[in-house]
């Protein structure tokens, strides 16, 4: 039995890459899918590029919203999705042509699965495999274990509460923390079927952190939101700090900013 798959693509200033992302979807060997692109208030030529693509693929669903961040854009797309399964793909990344068919094969061969994903390969400014820790309920509390493109059931996504729209970064990690608590059976495909673009831009994580401590605020928010889970797992805020510090390779001055912020926050917790 063929199941419809909804591919939801948030797009913010991706004029130079959105058609490449769409090509990777429309070149899939599995053809039972719908594509929903949500323009999140782009200020470049993204909207024009998407409309141009619609000239060849009239069935492409194109939505516009004011800039509210990737969480809100994905939730908006999901709200009109009709697929049995959903995949979120960012507007500057790509899927291997067999990504959907391979995920579907695993779901159909094992009805107990809740989430299927593949090895991630970097491209553009970096190459090689993008490291993600193997999932277990404790590890995911200190680092993300899944790419945004993991395939899940649409009904499970809504049962889980969707993306937290208060987050504009690390929103996928926070969502996976919640999702895997309710739907813990995951399958990793040992093939490079998702391509994650690494770019050198002013939007990079380190630059965001310089401007307004975006990462720090997100991690503190996640720790506070899931405080009981961290306590039950035996993780403390310093464990989260150490893990992210190593993973992101911040410079020392940013470690110091983070630690001072954490210290002030912890002092306020009674």
Where are these regions (language model features)?
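Nucleotide-sugar donor-binding/catalytic module of glycosyltransferases
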Residues: 1-213
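C-terminal subregions of glycosyltransferases and related glycan-biosynthesis enzymes
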Residues: 174, 181-188, 192-270
